[in-house]
């Protein structure tokens, strides 16, 4: 299982904090700050070297920047997302093309649905996590739902704020930060539980495995 080898050791509170700061930088049009935070977040989650974190972030930023200016034909950004994820050292059995599709999809649903996109974005994020971590969708559904909800809270808050996306956002950013922290805690818990199950199976003796098979109806 992927969780035993890749991206299993991140600090969920730190990752939530970094993503909150990334979103603020994105909406406040601070590209240099956004890139620096993305490099930190990639390194924190994937555990890769600084050169790989930077290279992967360059490709993911290129895709995100292109998407932000686009009005259609969004699939053309998938190749850069694929290359970006490939730099992060995902295991060979992970379908990186599928990972990129799910990553891009949650960007697209927010663009197409608008302020009510939280649930649809959460579904796409759930698919993304299931593909990356090789876990059943139901294990990571809560993490996906909460991150999608965080995006909707941000979008609705900014829409209602007289200062728009570039303002302080005191009415909504604290809730966004809380949802992202809770989302990453849920994801980390799902990864840890999945890894523990795999280790438990690996530690079983042949006799125990045979007994389990015989006990299965």
Predicted regions and their residues:
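Glycine-rich, aromatic-bearing surface loops/beta-hairpins
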Residues: 128-217
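Generic helix N-cap/helix-start motif at coil->alpha-helix transitions
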Residues: 11-19
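Hydrophobic/aromatic side-chain positions at a characteristic register within alpha-helices
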Residues: 23-27, 65-69
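Amphipathic alpha-helical segments of tetratricopeptide repeats
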Residues: 42-43, 82-86, 177
């Amino acid at each position: 299982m992927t969780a035993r080898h890749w991206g299993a050791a991140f600090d969920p509170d730190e990752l939530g904090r970094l993503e909150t700061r990334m979103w603020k930088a994105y909406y406040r049009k601070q590209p240099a700050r956004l890139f620096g935070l993305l490099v930190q977040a990639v390194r924190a989650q994937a555990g890769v070297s600084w050169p790989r974190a930077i290279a992967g972030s360059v490709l993911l930023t290129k895709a995100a920047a292109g998407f932000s200016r686009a009005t259609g034909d969004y699939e053309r950004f998938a190749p850069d997302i694929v290359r970006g994820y490939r730099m992060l050292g995902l295991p060979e059995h992970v379908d990186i093309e599928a990972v990129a599709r799910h990553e891009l999809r949650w960007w697209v649903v927010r663009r197409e649905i608008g302020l009510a996109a939280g649930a649809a974005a959460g579904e796409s994020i759930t698919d993304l996590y299931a593909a990356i971590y090789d876990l059943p969708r139901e294990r990571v559904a809560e993490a996906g739902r909460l991150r999608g909800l965080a995006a909707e809270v941000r979008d609705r808050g900014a829409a209602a704020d007289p200062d728009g996306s570039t303002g302080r956002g005191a009415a909504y950013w604290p809730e966004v930060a809380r949802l992202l922290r809770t989302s990453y805690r849920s994801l980390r818990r799902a990864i840890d539980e999945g890894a523990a199950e795999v280790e438990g199976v690996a530690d079983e003796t042949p006799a125990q495995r045979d007994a389990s098979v015989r006990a299965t109806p």
